[in-house]
Design a protein with these regions (language model features):
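Aromatic-lined carbohydrate-recognition surfaces of secreted/lumenal glycan-active proteins
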Residues: 116, 234-245, 268-305, 323-328
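Aromatic-lined substrate-binding rim segments of carbohydrate-active enzymes
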Residues: 131-198, 269-275, 279-282, 376
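The substrate-binding groove and active-site-proximal loops of carbohydrate-active enzymes
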Residues: 143-156, 203-216, 265-270, 363-366
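Aromatic- and acidic-residue-enriched segments that line the glycan-binding/catalytic groove
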Residues: 181-201, 243-263
């Protein structure tokens, strides 16, 4: 201790006792602190907890909330962009104008000769009517048998000759293929069923009109006929024919026993109608640019055949399909065939209708008086039937020339304004 005090005394001069005491206390405290820093002694906690089980408690730090004034910004107002509207002139295009489809008008008109059939010994176009200025054409009738002598074999010489005569005279032809009793006899050998009856005192036969073999061969013939002549300029009209009593008209002039036999052979209205429509289609197809017509008669006192057949033709072929009355007289139109007269008037409004005089003034067969002939011609004019077949005997009768000429002038005047 002495040594220490001497060292202190020697190195630290004090001015008085108070300074010396303060220095001593500082040294003591420094020594204690140095001892407390050793590894074996516990640290001195100047603020020990009051109880070892108490958890330290700290006062929460309370801070005033930071209040910031909301940032208020003036809305950005932009003027709308106004652009002038783009005005474009409308595109104006000329409308597409298409010409309407106009169905051809088939003016089947004029004075035609109801001349005799063409055969090996007779010509429909003959010298009796050679120099008649009012004559517009000739009915040329040729039998199917003459033009189709064997199955698949055709002889066109008869018709070629008539066309040659027509060309020389610059006249027209109304063509009719005689069927029925004028059908080829070889049809029976090919299997067609034939029906016998009496015509003008002669026993003849015709193929049953609904027979499949008959229809097949007749259709084949019509097709060949059209292939050869459909474009011929001298053929003005084609009469459609079927297997009937006289091979030209629609009727069957059977007696009661023959009617019974015909029905026993299978006749029904439906079968006959189907036969007619099949043949109409064949002719219309074979002659696509020619007017065609069918003669109308009651069949066994029924109008159904004629009505249905005509409706079929009009529906499919329109203005190209017409009708013919081969019974024409004023008396027949107003008293006998009134329903057929009605059909003619109906068809005339839609296409065309023609007449063939039932008789002649100049012959003893189906005789007419001159007054009856004049009345028949006038009735046809009054109803718009401007196609007329007049018997060649009357055409060659000079006493009737003025009557027939005046009638033909009326036809020309009426058709000129259509």
């Amino acid at each position: 201790m002495q040594t220490l005090n001497n060292k202190i005394s020697n190195k630290t001069p004090f001015k008085n006792a108070s300074d010396a005491l303060t220095s001593i206390l500082f040294l003591v405290l420094s020594s204690l602190l140095l001892v407390g820093c050793g590894g074996g002694s516990a640290p001195i906690d100047l603020n020990p907890p009051s109880n070892s089980n108490d958890t330290p408690t700290t006062d929460p730090v309370v801070t005033d909330p930071v209040v910031t004034d909301p940032v208020v910004t003036d809305p950005v107002v932009t003027d709308p962009v106004v652009t002038d509207p783009v005005v474009t002139d409308p595109v104006v295009t000329d409308p597409v104008v298409t010409d309407p489809v106009v169905e051809p008008t088939y003016k089947v008109t004029g004075t035609f000769c109801s001349c005799g059939p063409t055969s090996q010994t007779n010509s429909s176009i003959n010298r009796d009517t050679e120099n008649l200025d009012y004559l517009d054409g000739v009915l040329v009738r040729i039998s199917w048998a003459d033009m189709n002598p064997q199955a698949g074999i055709y002889d066109w010489s008869y018709l070629d000759e008539q066309i040659g005569y027509a060309e020389q005279r610059n006249t027209k032809i109304a063509l009719a293929i005689l069927n029925g009793p004028y059908a080829p006899t070889w049809l029976a050998e090919e299997g067609a069923t034939m029906f016998e009856y009496t015509l003008r005192g002669n026993v003849v036969s015709l193929p049953l009109p609904w027979d499949a073999v008959y229809l097949s061969y007749y259709q084949a013939f019509i097709e060949e006929l059209g292939a050869r002549y459909s474009g011929n300029e001298f053929i003005d009209l084609v009469h459609i024919t079927n297997s009937t009593t006289n091979g030209f008209e629609m009727q069957y002039t059977f007696d009661s026993a023959q009617i019974t036999d015909f029905k026993t052979a299978g006749y029904t209205e439906e079968l006959l109608i189907n036969s007619w429509t099949t043949i109409i289609d064949a002719y219309a197809t074979a002659f696509p640019n020619k007017p065609v017509d069918v003669e109308v008669h009651p069949v066994f006192f029924s109008d159904k055949i004629a009505t249905d057949v005509v409706d079929h033709g009009l529906a499919l072929y329109g203005k190209r399909f017409g009708v013919l009355a081969a019974w024409w007289s004023e008396h027949n139109a107003k008293n006998v065939y009134t329903s057929m007269f009605t059909i003619l008037k109906k068809v005339q409004k839609e296409s065309f209708a023609g007449v063939q005089l039932v008789g002649a003034v100049s012959t003893g067969l189906n005789p007419l008086t001159e007054e009856q002939l004049a009345a028949a011609l006038q009735l046809a004019i009054d109803n718009g039937f401007y196609y007329m077949e007049i018997w060649n005997n009357d055409l060659a009768n000079t006493q009737l020339s003025d009557l027939i000429t005046n009638n033909d002038n009326l036809i020309e005047a009426q058709t000129a304004v259509q």
